[in-house]
Amino acid sequence: MVPPTEVEKVRAFIRANIGKTLFSTGAKIVYFKGSLYNITGSTHDPQQVRDYEGENWKSLLVRKAELDDARCYVTNLSAPKGSNHDNFAVGGHMTTNPDGEVEKGGISYLMPLCKWHNSTARNGEAFEHTETKMLRLTGFMEGETPTTFMARMPSEKSHVLLYLDPLSGRWESSHLDAEQAIAPEAKLFSDAIKITQPSEYAVLENRGDGFFIKAAKLA
């Protein structure tokens, strides 16, 4: 079975949450010493990305926590010869719960991992680490992509436009004020993203207690 692409994951996330309140999100630097476990159901970094805001979990970790030169944090579970340990390949979603489960919208952690330790084959394994600087995430939802998580990060503007860019073929986001969000579609897109109307999009509104998908057009 072919795994879903990043475009398909974002589309599925939007479709599954139309009419529902989504959590606001946050990412805060913390220094955590305890054992951590891979989260079951978290999404890995896309294979091919451009390094800019919202594109992958690793770029969020590097930008927010300034971990450009980090290596994979895990010290107790030896990777086999020939693996990519100790490369910092992905931002790994972690929890203190041995079963790998996180309550919807609950707290999770993001730390540097190699792909070998980030594999689902390591689910349930306690990871020890001497490096402690990482991000504590709030509002993360199971199966969420970096695109939708980053779209709900704090902003002075009240709305977010998620759209499938016809040039790059990727989901991207742009923050909107209230006037832009209620404008006719043609003006909304030209003002917010300077391109003609994309084939797929969603408009999210921050209502204080979370975000609400107020409009969407999907394939």
Feature roles, as predicted:
Residues 128, 154-219:
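C-terminal, well-folded lobe of enzymatic/effector domains
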Residues 78-109:
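Histidine-centered nuclease catalytic patch
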Residues 41-64, 92-100:
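Short Cys/His-rich Zn2+-coordinating modules
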Residues 4, 17-20, 46, 54, ...:
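Long, charged interaction segments in nuclear RNA/chromatin-associated proteins
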Residues 56-88:
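Short cysteine-rich loop/turn motifs with clustered Cys
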Residues 1-52, 78:
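A boundary/linker detector
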Residues 100-108, 120-160, 164:
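Polybasic, low-complexity binding patches
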